[in-house]
């Protein structure tokens, strides 16, 4: 017997439903005499960031010459819960080797400075609006 968890994230709830159906279909199979039981432990709604705030961050990064891209985050950051109550967005800073939320995570001072600069200028844009 062994136990493991599977975390599925996507911005489209219909895609998540399909993923869950695929995972649940494992219960119908047997591998070398082993079976599988799937239990959905918890669920949360997809959170969408405030489009105006995202536009401020994007414009700020572009004006400062900071390389950027839009990504959807399914992570359970505090901002996810704040987004239900007030306009919210997030800025992610590049991590070495893409490692995040673990001991070897490292973001260079240059990348942190770029993230802070993008955030400061986005806040100033929001304040001027």
Report the location of each language-model feature.
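Active-site-adjacent substrate-binding region
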Residues: 35, 39-94
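A common structural junction motif
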Residues: 24-32
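Generic anion/oxyanion-binding catalytic loop in active/binding sites
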Residues: 5, 71, 101
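Hydrophobic alpha-helix feature that most strongly marks membrane-spanning transmembrane helices
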Residues: 7, 28, 62, 84, ...
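Midchain, well-structured core segments that form catalytic/ion-binding scaffolds
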Residues: 1-18, 42
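His/Asp/Glu-rich mid-to-C-terminal helical/loop segments that flank catalytic regions of hydrolases
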Residues: 14-15, 20-25, 93-129
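Short gly/pro-enriched beta-turn/loop segments at secondary-structure junctions
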Residues: 1-2, 31-34
